[in-house]
């Protein structure tokens, strides 16, 4: 994947995180995931999330990694 395409995907990740969080506060979202609220804040502000966070998010929230990272397909994984 070209560098420009990677950067575009990275720029859109904070927006997708906010979509997953929905109407929950960052504090509640962090609690639901078992992570620190400061990390959620940093990731929604544009810091690249750690792999562990992304995996936890995908598993606990039933989120498609393709959608989360690339914006492709449906947000929710099939059960």
Segments and roles (model prediction):
Residues 67-79:
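Short amphipathic recognition helices of helix-turn-helix/homeodomain-type DNA-binding modules
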Residues 44, 61, 72:
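DNA major-groove recognition helix of helix-turn-helix
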Residues 1-24, 32:
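A short, Lys/Arg-rich alpha-helix, primarily the initiator
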Residues 23, 46, 74:
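Alpha-helical DNA-recognition elements
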Residues 22-42:
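Short alpha-helical DNA-recognition segment
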Residues 52-67:
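DNA major-groove recognition helix of helix-turn-helix/homeodomain DNA-binding modules
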């Amino acid at each position: 994947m070209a560098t420009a395409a990677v950067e575009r995907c990275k720029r859109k990740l904070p927006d997708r995180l906010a979509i997953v969080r929905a109407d929950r506060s960052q504090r509640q979202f962090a609690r639901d995931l078992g992570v620190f609220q400061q990390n959620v804040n940093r990731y929604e502000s544009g810091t690249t999330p750690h792999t562990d966070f992304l995996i936890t998010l995908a598993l606990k929230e039933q989120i498609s990694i393709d959608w989360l990272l690339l914006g492709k397909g449906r947000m929710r994984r099939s059960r």
